[in-house]
Amino acid sequence: MYKFVVFAAALAYANAGLIGAPAVAAYSAAPAVSSAYIHQAAPVAVAHAAPLAVAHAPVAVAHAAPYAIHAPAVGASHQSVVRSLGGNQAVSHYSKAVDSAFSSVRKFDTRVTNDALAVAHAPVVSTYAHAAPVVSTYAHAAPVVSSYAAHAPVAAYAAHAPVATYAAHAPVATYAAHAPVVATRTSAVAYSPAAVVSHASFSGLGASYAW
């Protein structure tokens, strides 16, 4: 195959030289020269890296010696029985306790027994009580009694006693005019004392009095 390619290339090269020359040019016969060139790329050198060396180390498991803990458990129990006088009834108590460093447990048990106890179911008694009737009572209010205390009438009225005596100015007994002197005698006017007069009046309780 490559020979055909070389031949075709040589023929094309020869024809190119003949066609490109001018028509007036004369060529002398040249010796036939055949050249063949083959260019091949250098082979690619593929270098594979050395395989990775994987070393698996053995797993070393070290078991430690068990650690001993000295933690004793403490337990206690208690039991008591109490009986009645005849021995028919008994009450028993039982308790137990266990304590350790990691836990604590308690248990209690109480039982009551009575050999002479007869269980009888009491009959169901239903009672119904009617409510007391409602009694309506009405109390009349006491009448309002209005009392008015009037002032007692005045039993006696004392008026001012009139003046028992009245003294008037005595008239002028003589009159002197420009006249001849005449001997005159004046006489004094005397009044007797008036009697004492008292008046009183009363009006009230349907009666009127005056004196």
Swiss-Prot record:
Residues 128-147 are annotated as: 2 X 10 AA tandem repeat of Y-A-H-A-A-P-V-V-S-[ST]. Residues 148-183 are annotated as: 4 X 9 AA tandem repeat of Y-A-A-H-A-P-V-[VA]-[AT]. One of its GO terms (molecular function) is structural constituent of cuticle. Restricted to sternal, tergal, legs and wing anlagen epidermis, and soft cuticle secreting epidermis, such as intersegmental membranes and pleura. No expression in muscles or fat body. Pfam families: Cuticle_3. Keywords: Cuticle, Repeat, Signal. Induction: By juvenile hormone. Residues 1-16 form the signal peptide. Sequence repeats lie at residues 29-32, 41-44, 128-137, 131-134, 138-147, 141-144, 148-156, 157-165, 166-174, 175-183. Component of the hard and soft cuticles of the larva and pupa of Tenebrio molitor. The tetrapeptide (A-A-P-[AV]) repeats found throughout the protein are also present in many proteins constituting the protective envelope of other species. This is Larval/pupal cuticle protein H1C.
